[in-house]
Amino acid sequence: MVSKTASVIFTIEQINDLHARLGSARTLPEYVLALKGLGVERYDSYVADGHSEYFGQGGHRVVSPPVHEVLPVAETGQRETFLQHLRRHERHETTYLEMSRGLAMSGIEKWTVETGSMTMTFYDKAGREMLVEQIK
């Protein structure tokens, strides 16, 4: 008999498969729901090199490899500049790498997606919340 509290163990291969199918701004809600279905409770994506860390129950964690060259992240978060870069990307005016460069110049260290609350939070290097968005 399997315990109802048993942890769901997901792999980086499963996440990569979902990302290949649903990993775009247009399909973000479906992507996050699919991650939740795998057992991912939260993930952090780091602007400096594009790697992500995925967390599940019982301390389960998997890490993706870097996806681009290392970008220097500004020491101080600049909210208005950050929002300009983010909005340009949301309008499909920039590539992922161009957005990442803009976020790094704006002092954004990472974003965190919570699959339960369907939120995405952007943080600067000091750990300050720069923006919390509902994923819809």
Predicted regions and their residues:
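Charged, low-complexity surface segments at secondary-structure and domain boundaries
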Residues: 1, 16-17, 67-72
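Glycine-rich, aromatic-bearing surface loops/beta-hairpins
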Residues: 122-136
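Short, solvent-exposed interaction modules
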Residues: 62-111
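Short glycine-rich, low-complexity/disordered patches
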Residues: 25-37, 46, 91-118
